[in-house]
């Protein structure tokens, strides 16, 4: 059977000399892995993580790993390789997708979101965009946070906390008696114009990390590329 789609290469693993297994996040078919062969400098340039490609997958049976052929649409490597913030954010993003999405499970809307994120990242690293990516990823996997209004009083102002149980924002008045049991809601997530402090970065990463650990990172197993991004971000403010 054949599958033809557009995709982003998110992993590449050596099988033997000049032969690799690539994992591609495709628009209409989700994650697919296939064997590719590199025999030229051109093909080595095509099969790089982050490249947007035309992806052709062929196998006798659907459950087989299959062979893959790719044509390059766009490469982001040059934009990320010389900037650590961009590179670590990129590595974290593709590693999270590989870790949290199941093989051959469609995420077409999220694919478009990813392409837009990579395009913006190629121009400029923005911490707000990165956290919004993690929040979107949580939502895509079934764990959406509601930060638009208080989960109890429904007010839309003075939102300070997030409930770890309901994943909803809480106002200062509602949350104050329970503040030691609540997560902090970073101010920058409520306003596109506010500057982001180091403390708010810590709060934002703690927020998404809590829900990743609770629902998605089994046995509290962390994604190494994400940890590298966090360490770099918090130590290079």
UniProtKB/Swiss-Prot annotation:
InterPro entries reported in the protein's UniProt record: ARFGAP/RecO (IPR037278), DNA_rep/recomb_RecO_N (IPR022572), RecO (IPR003717), RecO_C (IPR042242)
Pfam families registered for this protein in UniProt: RecO_C, RecO_N
A cellular-component GO term for this protein: bacterial nucleoid
GO biological process, one term: DNA recombination
UniProt keyword terms in alphabetical order: DNA damage, DNA recombination, DNA repair
Top-level taxon of origin: Bacteria
Annotated PANTHER family: DNA REPAIR PROTEIN RECO
NCBIfam families in UniProt: reco
Family: Belongs to the RecO family.
Role description: Involved in DNA repair and RecF pathway recombination.
The protein's name: DNA repair protein RecO
UniProt organism field: Rickettsia africae (strain ESF-5)
Source organism phylogeny: Bacteria, Pseudomonadati, Pseudomonadota, Alphaproteobacteria, Rickettsiales
